[in-house]
Regions:
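Extended hydrophobic secondary-structure segments that form protein cores and membrane-embedded regions
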Residues: 65-71, 178-179, 208-211
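P-loop NTPase Walker
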Residues: 1-107
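Structural motif corresponding to the C-terminal cap of alpha-helices
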Residues: 52-56, 162-167, 199
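Conserved RecA-like helicase ATPase core segment
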Residues: 50, 196-211
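Conserved protein kinase catalytic core
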Residues: 99, 188-189
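Short, glycine/acidic-enriched loop or turn micro-motifs at the edges of active sites
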Residues: 96, 185-186
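Short helix-terminating capping/connector loops at secondary-structure junctions
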Residues: 58-64, 173-174, 203-207
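Accessory N-terminal region flanking or inserted into the helicase ATPase core
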Residues: 1-38, 43, 106-183, 189-194, ...
Length: 211
């Protein structure tokens, strides 16, 4: 009588999930290495559901969230649907996530924009930086007397620049004790370098999950 062999992909997925659960229980950061079609999204959703079950009420009560940063809108929508848009989880694309955070700090953004070398000519032509409103809606960089508009690539770069400052590291930490990054290998390099340098390497107490 022949034995039924277990599906190797299923066995690997179960083992990966076990390791993720162990890391979450211990409060450790982790990285899931798996190729396309290896069930990374399933593992990410399962990890989010575990956090919702175990910490969801506490996170909502204290005004904190698990950040789940996706590479595409499609992934964002899929994950948000799977967790039923639970209020303890913020699921967004990297640009949506970064803009939601940095837009709170208008003066800091204006100061940082003025430090970016390839912006200086346009800033000068636009009359300089004063107290304009900084916006991200047109998709290109411009400056006039009333507003500064940011382009697509500015958003993660400015987020990385902001996170280099201790004040904003603390504010970020207060809001997001757990950060999951989907398709981290394709995620903006400056943003990933900032997360690694200021939250992963120093062992800040954050749980960083890289999928």
């Amino acid at each position: 009588m022949s034995q039924i062999k277990e599906n190797p992909a299923l066995v690997a997925a179960q083992e990966a999930q076990r390791k993720i659960n162990e890391a979450l229980d211990a409060g450790y950061s982790f990285r899931l290495e798996a190729g396309a079609g290896a069930g990374k999204t399933y593992s990410l959703v399962a990890a989010l559901k575990k956090l919702i079950d175990e910490r969801g009420s506490m996170l909502v009560r204290t005004g904190k969230k698990v950040a789940c940063i996706t590479y595409t809108e499609v992934a964002r929508n899929e994950i948000a649907q799977e967790i039923e848009d639970h209020p303890a989880i913020l699921v967004d694309t990297i640009h949506g996530f970064c803009w939601a955070f940095i837009r709170q700090f208008q003066k800091a953004i204006r100061d940082l924009v003025s430090e970016i070398d390839d912006k200086k000519e346009k800033i000068e032509l636009g009359g300089g930086i004063g107290s304009q409103l900084v916006e991200y809606d047109l998709g290109f960089f411009s400056v006039d007397e009333k507003r500064i508009t940011l382009n697509h690539d500015d958003i993660p770069e400015l987020m990385a620049m902001l996170l280099a400052k201790e004040k904003f590291q603390m504010l970020f930490s207060e809001q997001f004790p757990v950060i999951f990054i989907d398709e981290y290998q394709d995620t903006n390099r400056k943003f990933m370098d900032a997360i690694t340098e200021f939250f992963l390497k120093p062992k800040t107490g954050h749980i960083i999950g890289l999928f």
